[in-house]
């Protein structure tokens, strides 16, 4: 049995690792969105034509390694890095004094292999656009959970004293609109040209009509965010909540600008990749805004 002094020492050492590992989880999953986008935008979605193996012969590409195989295999390899980070995060929280973070660290750790399984199903279904859509949304959810983990680490007291009011209701509406934007965006992608492979099926929906719907939902999202900024200022809410809402609005405007430019320039891959990064940033920013608003009211 460890002495109290030894136990406190171990807790302190573990505490030092919790925050960096939380950031590693967040940034690693953002990178996974970017590399997953690279897989799709370069037509490398079936660079490893099966799952969980890369080919029928093994887990790594065999024979002449082409660019598509290298990109897809690199994306899969990143998942193993995220698994290691997730396990390290669970161990750190279990050994730290922050017992309130343990359950969330386990959820994050389970989310990584779940997301990988969904990716495997996407490969086994020849990049079915609905499965690919869900695959991306899983990453967005993990990014949001990583932000929640970091926020709770920073605000251990506030996390247990959350109240609700009209401004929080507006923040929830903004959060819901953000997720509607993300979902419709994946459906738009499923109808467009960047399928991940030349033979991959599309969802058969009209990309022009879907793009219009996506734009309409974005305008709703921006309007709600503007309303939230004004409501937070009018109610003299905590500076952290006002700052979070302003950052969210700035991210939305930048993301919307990229979206409009890519639409009118025939979806160049660089802009589509930036738009994917923007989507990951939206998920992080809207989660942060909701948490700060709930804590400030």
Can you annotate each of these PLM segments?
Residues 1-297:
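Polytopic transmembrane helical bundles with strong interfacial aromatic enrichment
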